[in-house]
Amino acid sequence: MFVDSVEIIIASGKGGPGMVSFRREKFVIKGGPDGGDGGDGGDVYFEVDNNTDTLASFRGTKHHKAKNGAPGGTRNCAGKKGEDKIIVVPPGTQVFVGDKLWLDLITPKERVLALKGGKGGLGNAHFKSATKQQPTYAQKGLEGVEKCVRLELKLIADIGLVGFPNAGKSTLISTISNAKPKIANYEFTTLVPNLGVVSVDEKSEFLMADIPGIIEGASQGKGLGISFLKHIERTKVLAFVLDASRLDLGIKEQYQRLRLELEKFSPALANKPFGVLLNKCDVVENIDKMAKDFCAFLNLEAQKLEAFGLEPYLGFLHPHLTSDFENNPNEKSALFVLPLSAVSALNTHALKFVLLEALP
């Protein structure tokens, strides 16, 4: 089950109390104080685990507390430190206290101290003085710290697929990656984001994210709305997946409506580098003309992707991807326009190389 938002309570451990004791040995009637210090309370850490991509493990487990420190012992023995609490989260997890962002956990294997445990109390050996040889007092341990926090997950991927419901995003990600999403011929088959690793060759791979289909008004929460748009905020490149076979809504209108929703949600998201995939091209007549017209619509001075072996359909790349073009392309310009068919795997092999080249 995919979960991307939970509220939990975290607490560090209480420090252990110091010990009140006196040295007792044979022939020693009144030994001095030898009470040990209490152990410090356990700390709370967040640790980023690259092997998980959901917060589902937190469902039903609201309280996450470190252990208390052990009491001090006799003969100046210090108490054991309380066991730390390690809270494992997926990359891209943000920790909020109220509405304020507290921690942003991105790097795999990163471990961040969230709460420090309470300090252990001092034993009575610390309170011996010239005027008080037999102190009967020891400190209590300090209390730990408790916080109510909200965990929000924003998936981290290199490529983010954006499109209307039933555009073929899930079929595409299942064709070129190791992801196995549910696929069916009706809208909103995909109800949660899917992540897939795309292997290009023995040395190169990248991570692709497929989010549920966007509808008009998604930026205001319609459909699956804002709850999933946030998952493409961290992607490096967006790939608009357009259904070239739709008769009721042309590819230009699809693109314009999708971009409008992104701009309403986040201007920074709308300004990310992007490319366009014209899916279901195997059932469209004169797909080459459609692709050329769409390039003209985008003001894209493009060239055929002969280097990537695209057959039998044309593909178009921004010159930035096919040469040592030193100047970065305009952020509003498409990096590629590529007809393909996810179902029949037409041009999907070449797509891997195109996407790899598009990554900064």
From Swiss-Prot:
The keyword GTP-binding applies. Its cofactor is Mg(2+). Keywords: Cytoplasm, GTP-binding, Hydrolase, Magnesium, Metal-binding, Nucleotide-binding. Residues 157-360 form the OBG-type G domain. Mg(2+) binds at S170, T190. Residues 1-156 form the Obg domain. GTP binds at residues 163-170, 188-192, 210-213, 279-282, 341-343. Pfam families: GTP1_OBG, MMR_HSR1. GO terms for biological process: ribosome biogenesis. GO terms for cellular component: cytoplasm. NCBIfam families: Obg_CgtA, PRK12297.1, PRK12299.1. Belongs to the TRAFAC class OBG-HflX-like GTPase superfamily. OBG GTPase family. Monomer. An essential GTPase which binds GTP, GDP and possibly (p)ppGpp with moderate affinity, with high nucleotide exchange rates and a fairly low GTP hydrolysis rate. Plays a role in control of the cell cycle, stress response, ribosome biogenesis and in those bacteria that undergo differentiation, in morphogenesis control. This is GTPase Obg. It comes from Helicobacter pylori (strain HPAG1).
